[in-house]
């Protein structure tokens, strides 16, 4: 049974009052603007159709919400009213017609300006000095936020110029620019803080901080759009003139403000700003039209909460409410695991949205998004739609908090997150199809396997065609495939490709190939990959196609089969393993077969490799898909590592079970405690077999003993410790004795290169210095042994001189290398 008009009106008043409190007092909107506007318009229609239902305390007769009580109250000398809204061209035409009829004018000029999506404020100046700033509140009474407003650089503390009134109230909008909003949220995500839903919330929440220092840390901005009380002075007789005068007195005024004539001028402005909306540095939710003539404004007057001479023309809503039907994981090109909400389709900003990003697991936890929830989804321009909040009042019973899956939905590898990071990642770098293109491009890059000529477009099409599924497949590429690829990429459409192919196909059997190509849909973005996947035999007409490039690329692929260990390690694309880490791993362990089977704590034996990098290496090599990709690379691709050698003798230093326990980052296990433990329980198996009491008897504090027992019971830890002990024994068996180490002349010294060298490339100089034992760093410090400065050396040279670090020129470096190499 439908509610009566009186019951419906009461329900609408309750919902609108609740929404007003959330929006104006708590700075935490619970429903999208479009839902709010819809309820207000429905209530206005009910009160028009049933005048007996109209009440003085109705939201249709009020502005904003009462002050929160957290700040001193300020009574506005001139009320800060709201604006009526228009949502269609017809409503704008009616607005112009009403003014025309009331004033009897045929040519009406309006000041048009963007409707900022921020917080309305009033600034009071006495004798040119800023003395008071207040929020709108309920239109009559606002909150004193003067201290916070003083932290906004856009707001002048003293008026510029001259001839300002004795008392001047300036009305305007405090907002947060999009770039500042994104920077704030990025910092919050990294620090585990609260991520704000949108720039409007960010501005309002920042301005209502009790500590002005917090407001100062959040970059807020301001635009002036009008005036309130004015005493002891005159303002121009047009609104546009007043804005120009405010600009001369030091207030920011939007450059988008424009004077237009009549309905056509207003609608033209609306469409122009609408087209520019997504590219603006700030959020707007519409435009505002104001009769430019102040005398006309006074003649038009006001209704209860809004002027008759102004109206807001709203854009299509960028936020809507809908339902979460599922939460799935999407794996990006670099392995980032991004949760995506699958939504009941809803129109947002003129586009049907059925998916929205949830950014990361921390964001889901902060919002507490669950399957079945009603949520607010936001879409601004080309930005990916995102879920910004949950409507908790609509949450169905029986929902449960969402948990990040443990396995990649694409390849089944473990999904991992390093300590302190916001993003989770699929650890199947080499084997995950979602990461395939990125992994192959990195593998072939100049500083990795250096396969010159294999560009991104080639890789993309080869992968899409299913010809290259792993890095090992690069070594299966043939000259025919590459020439076929070039024809495919050069063709504008399937018919053009068929014509090009016809020149290189044998007469017998070519018809089937050409017909298959001609059937492809040229409007399908994947048609080229489909064409390349078509099997074909070729008889290349070398007068009609260049072949040298393909021969060169095949030669580059063949040449990459003989590679150094550091290049192969870097080419694998392991998270956190750059060139310098790959070089260090190669120098210290010497053999890919050893490295690929090491438990992660042993990687920490290498200087400058900490827990984060070591765990990343461990996760990578634990994935069966990655191990299979390496096997294929060595067996199918026939990649041969040219510089295999024994592990460094330096690994022997302090390498024992006690150190393994410390490197495993077991809570409370220090070197001294580990030595006591191993003295009582020699061997990893003995430690695994022991119980809490034996750990205490070995000298561990009770809480440390309990923590060790819990750690050993955790999945995989015991097996890892046993494997680490076995790997340690293998290293000790293979590494030469410490006495056999021949120290380089630069062992233990740190060198920095800066500027341009005439006779050496930066890479060549670095390689030769490292061969003599030096560590080549990218930054200068007191620990730097010397700096090699070429021409156009910059700040590094200046810093070296200020710290008293020795500076060598290129001639001295070359002489030293000639003497010691």
UniProtKB/Swiss-Prot annotation:
EC number of this enzyme: 6.5.1.2
Q: Where is the BRCT domain?
A: 741-821
UniProt KW 4Fe-4S keyword = no
Report the record's Gene Ontology biological process terms: DNA repair; DNA replication
Per UniProt, Zn(2+) binds at: 408, 411, 426, 432
Q: Which CDD domains match?
A: BRCT_DNA_ligase_like (cd17748), LIGANc (cd00114)
Give the enzyme's main class according to its UniProt record, as a single word. ligase
What does the UniProt keyword field contain? DNA damage, DNA repair, DNA replication, Ligase, Magnesium, Manganese, Metal-binding, NAD, Zinc
Provide the GO MF annotations for this entry: DNA ligase (NAD+) activity; metal ion binding
Instruction: Give the binding site residues for NAD(+).
Output: 33-37, 82-83, 113, 136, 173, 290, 314
- A GO cellular-component term linked to this record: cytosol
Pfam families listed in its UniProt record: BRCT (PF00533), DNA_ligase_aden (PF01653), DNA_ligase_OB (PF03120), DNA_ligase_ZBD (PF03119), HHH_2 (PF12826), HHH_5 (PF14520), Nlig-Ia (PF22745)
Q: Which cofactor does it need?
A: Mg(2+); Mn(2+)
Q: InterPro entries of this UniProt entry? A: BRCT_dom, BRCT_dom_sf, DisA/LigA_HHH, DNA_ligase, DNA_ligase_AS, DNAligase_adenylation, DNAligase_N, NA-bd_OB-fold
The reaction(s) catalysed by this protein are:
NAD(+) + (deoxyribonucleotide)n-3'-hydroxyl + 5'-phospho-(deoxyribonucleotide)m = (deoxyribonucleotide)n+m + AMP + beta-nicotinamide D-nucleotide
Active site positions: 115 (n6-amp-lysine intermediate)
Check the UniProt entry and state the signal peptide residues, or none: none
From which domain of life does this come? Answer: Bacteria
What SMART domains has UniProt attached to this entry? Answer: BRCT (SM00292), LIGANc (SM00532)
Tell me, what does this protein do in biology?
A: DNA ligase that catalyzes the formation of phosphodiester linkages between 5'-phosphoryl and 3'-hydroxyl groups in double-stranded DNA using NAD as a coenzyme and as the energy source for the reaction. It is essential for DNA replication and repair of damaged DNA.
Matching PANTHER family? CHROMOSOME TRANSMISSION FIDELITY FACTOR 18, DNA LIGASE
User: What NCBIfam families does the record point to?
Assistant: dnlj, PRK07956.1
The entry's family comment says: Belongs to the NAD-dependent DNA ligase family. LigA subfamily.
Q: What is this protein called?
A: DNA ligase
User: What is the native source organism of this protein?
Assistant: Stenotrophomonas maltophilia (strain K279a)
């Amino acid at each position: 049974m439908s509610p009566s008009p009186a019951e419906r009106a009461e329900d609408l008043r309750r919902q609108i009052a609740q929404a007003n409190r959330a929006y104006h007092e708590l700075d935490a909107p619970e429903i999208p603007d479009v839902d709010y506007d819809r309820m207000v318009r429905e209530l206005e229609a009910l009160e028009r159709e049933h005048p007996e239902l109209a009440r003085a305390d109705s939201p249709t007769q009020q502005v904003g919400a009462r002050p929160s009580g957290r700040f001193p109250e300020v009574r506005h000398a001139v009320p800060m009213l709201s604006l009526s809204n228009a949502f269609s061209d017809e409503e704008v035409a009616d607005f112009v017609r009403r003014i025309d009829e009331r004033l009897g004018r045929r040519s009406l000029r309006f000041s048009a300006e963007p409707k900022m999506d921020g917080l309305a404020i009033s600034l009071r100046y006495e004798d040119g000095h800023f003395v008071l700033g207040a929020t709108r509140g309920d239109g009559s009474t606002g909150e004193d936020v003067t201290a916070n407003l003083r932290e906004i650089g856009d707001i002048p503390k003293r008026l510029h110029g001259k001839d300002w009134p004795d008392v001047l109230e300036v009305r305007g909008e405090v907002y947060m620019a999009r770039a500042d909003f994104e920077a704030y949220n990025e910092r919050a995500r990294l620090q585990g803080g609260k991520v704000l839903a949108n720039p409007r919330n960010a501005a309002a929440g920042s301005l209502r901080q009790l500590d002005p220092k917090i407001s100062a840390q959040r970059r807020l901005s301001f635009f002036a759009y009008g005036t309130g009380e004015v005493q002891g002075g005159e303002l121009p007789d047009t609104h546009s003139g007043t804005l120009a005068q405010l600009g001369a007195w030091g207030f920011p005024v939007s450059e988008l403000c424009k004077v237009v004539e009549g309905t056509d001028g207003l609608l033209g402005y609306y469409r122009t700003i609408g087209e520019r909306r997504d590219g603006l540095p700030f959020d707007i939710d519409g435009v505002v039209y104001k009769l430019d003539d102040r005398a006309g404004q006074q003649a038009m007057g006001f209704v209860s909460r809004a002027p008759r001479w102004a109206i807001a023309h709203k854009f299509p809503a960028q936020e809507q409410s809908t339902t979460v039907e599922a939460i799935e994981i999407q794996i990006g090109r670099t392995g980032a695991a991004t949760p995506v909400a699958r939504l009941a389709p809803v129109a947002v900003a003129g586009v049907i949205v059925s998916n929205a990003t949830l950014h990361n697991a921390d964001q889901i936890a902060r919002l507490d998004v669950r399957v079945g929830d009603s949520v607010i989804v936001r879409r601004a321009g080309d930005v990916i739609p995102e879920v910004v909040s949950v409507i908790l009042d609509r949450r169905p019973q029986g929902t449960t908090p969402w948990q990040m899956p443990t396995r990649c939905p694409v390849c089944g590898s473990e999904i991992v997150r390093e300590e302190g990071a916001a993003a989770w990642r699929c650890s199947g770098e080499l084997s995950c199809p979602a990461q395939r293109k990125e992994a192959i491009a990195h593998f072939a890059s100049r500083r990795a396997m250096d396969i010159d000529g294999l560009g991104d477009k080639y890789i993309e099409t080869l992968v899409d065609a299913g010809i290259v599924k792993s890095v090992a497949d690069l070594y299966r590429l043939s000259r025919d495939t590459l020439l076929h690829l070039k024809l495919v990429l050069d063709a504008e459409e399937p018919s053009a490709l068929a014509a090009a192919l016809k020149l290189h196909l044998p007469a017998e059997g070519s018809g089937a190939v050409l017909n298959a190509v001609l059937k492809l849909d040229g409007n399908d973005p994947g048609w080229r990959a489909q064409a390349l996947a078509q099997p074909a035999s070729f008889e290349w007409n070398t007068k009609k196609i260049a072949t040298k490039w393909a021969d060169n690329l095949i030669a580059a692929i063949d040449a990459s089969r003989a590679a150094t260990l550091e290049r192969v390690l870097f080419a694998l694309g392991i998270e956190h393993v750059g060139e310098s880490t790959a070089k260090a791993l190669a120098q210290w362990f010497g053999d890919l077969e050893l490295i690929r089977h090491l438990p992660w704590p042993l990687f920490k034996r290498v200087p400058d490799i900490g827990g984060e990098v070591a765990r990343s290496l461990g996760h990578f090599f634990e994935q069966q898909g990655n191990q299979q990709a390496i096997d294929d690379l060595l067996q199918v691709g026939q990649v041969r590592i040219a510089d295999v050698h024994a592990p460094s003798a330096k690994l022997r230093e302090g390498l024992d079970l006690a150190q393994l326990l410390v490197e495993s980052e077991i809570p409370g296990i220090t070197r001294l405690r580990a030595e006591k433990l191993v003295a009582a329980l020699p061997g990893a198996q003995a430690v695994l077999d022991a119980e809490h009491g034996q750990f205490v008897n070995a000298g561990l504090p009770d809480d440390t003993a309990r923590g060790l027992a819990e750690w050993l019971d955790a999945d995989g830890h015991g097996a890892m410790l046993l494997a680490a002990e076995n790997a340690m024994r293998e290293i000790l068996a293979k590494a030469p004795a410490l006495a056999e180490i021949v120290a380089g002349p630069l062992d233990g010294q740190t060198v920095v290169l800066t500027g341009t060298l005439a006779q050496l490339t930066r890479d060549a100089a670095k390689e030769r210095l490292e061969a003599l034992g030096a560590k080549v760093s990218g930054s200068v410090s007191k620990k730097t042994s010397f700096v090699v400065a070429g021409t156009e050396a910059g700040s590094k040279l200046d810093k070296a001189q200020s710290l008293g670090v020795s500076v060598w020129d290129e001639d001295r470096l070359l002489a030293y290398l000639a003497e010691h190499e």
